[in-house]
A protein has these predicted regions:
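Glycine-rich hexapeptide-repeat left-handed beta-helix
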Residues: 1-68, 195-196, 202-276
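Terminal amphipathic alpha-helical/low-complexity segments used for targeting or macromolecular assembly
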Residues: 24-173, 261-276
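Alpha-helix N-cap/loop-to-helix boundary motif
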Residues: 157-160, 172, 193, 199, ...
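Conserved short histidine dyad/triad with adjacent acidic residue
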Residues: 158-163, 181-184, 210-211
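Soluble catalytic regions of membrane-associated enzymes that act on cell-envelope
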Residues: 181, 186-187, 193, 200-202
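Active-site-adjacent structural elements in folded domains
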Residues: 166-167, 188, 212-217
């Protein structure tokens, strides 16, 4: 598939020359036409022509972002002051083996707990649904995402690939079973309430539990059933349901509301069952 004004290299071959129909949607490698796309109608005041009040609401949340870095800075200053006060009163071994790790852990915990509290204060328990771009909910949702990246992402990155990370993510709203192993990328989750992981899963993928289409945010659950394995850099779109003990190969894409059968291996963009 070639886009308008694109460049074709010398000695290349086009197998078939067919014009796309206006308004059609395509995806995949090789690309295929999507049979239909869910279109959500929303008032233009919430999508393209916001009122002055809605513009003011968005500006307030955008300006508030400038205050977010102050929290980790203050925590860092407190960390330095506490350790400076303890250094002269403890032996070198006590300072390095006890005081330093304990104060560092406490500082990281403050940032994570503050982010958890902000999540429940700003958006509470999120349900599947739709939210227009200029709604107050979208502004608060986006503000939380930025705050998580500045406050909790770095401390939680040290827990990626361990059995401790699921315990923290449950406090954010994730539903995670026992012995779940979550790899890189789960230190900063966009939609924690949408993630449903069963027992014994192994996941190192992008959970795309929302999309913005026509300036409307659509959000829904992503299910990974017991014993399933999701490879590195795979993408699961909202509504995806991975069957028990199934395997999704790295760099694959599971489409919206697609259900993968249990005990089956999948790969591709979009995913297809692997023969044998």
């Amino acid at each position: 598939m070639s886009v308008p004004e694109s460049h074709r290299p010398d000695d290349s071959t086009s197998a078939e020359l067919v014009a796309d129909e206006p308004g059609s949607s395509w995806f995949g490698h090789p690309p295929f036409r999507l049979p239909r796309r869910e279109v959500i109608e929303a008032p233009r005041e919430l999508t393209h022509d916001p009122s002055a009040i809605r513009r003011l609401n968005r500006w307030c949340w955008e300006v508030a972002r400038f205050a977010l870095p102050a929290v980790p800075v203050l925590v860092g200053v407190a960390w330095f002051d506490v350790l400076s006060g303890l250094e002269g009163r403890l032996t070198a071994a006590e300072f390095r083996l006890v005081a330093l790790p304990c104060v560092t852990f406490a500082s990281a915990a403050v940032l994570v707990v503050a982010c958890i509290a902000m999540k429940w204060a700003l958006i509470g328990r999120v349900r599947p649904g739709t939210h227009a771009l200029w709604s107050c909910w979208c502004s608060r949702w986006d503000f939380l995402y930025v705050a998580w990246g500045m406050w909790a992402a770095v401390p939680l990155s040290f827990l990626e690939g361990t059995l401790m990370l699921p315990g923290v993510l449950r406090r954010f709203g994730c539903r995670i079973g026992r012995r779940a192993l979550l790899g890189a990328g789960f230190a900063h989750v966009v939609d924690p309430d949408m993630l449903r992981f069963g027992d014994g899963v192994t996941v190192q993928a992008l959970m795309q539990a929302h999309t913005f289409e026509d300036r409307v945010l659509k959000i829904d659950h992503v299910h990974v059933r017991d014993g399933a394995t999701i490879g590195a850099n795979a993408v699961l779109l909202y509504g995806a349901d991975i069957g028990e003990r199934s395997t999704v190969a790295p760099h694959s894409v599971v489409m919206k509301r697609e259900r993968l059968e249990p005990d089956t291996a999948y790969e591709g963009v979009p995913t297809q069952p692997v023969a044998g």
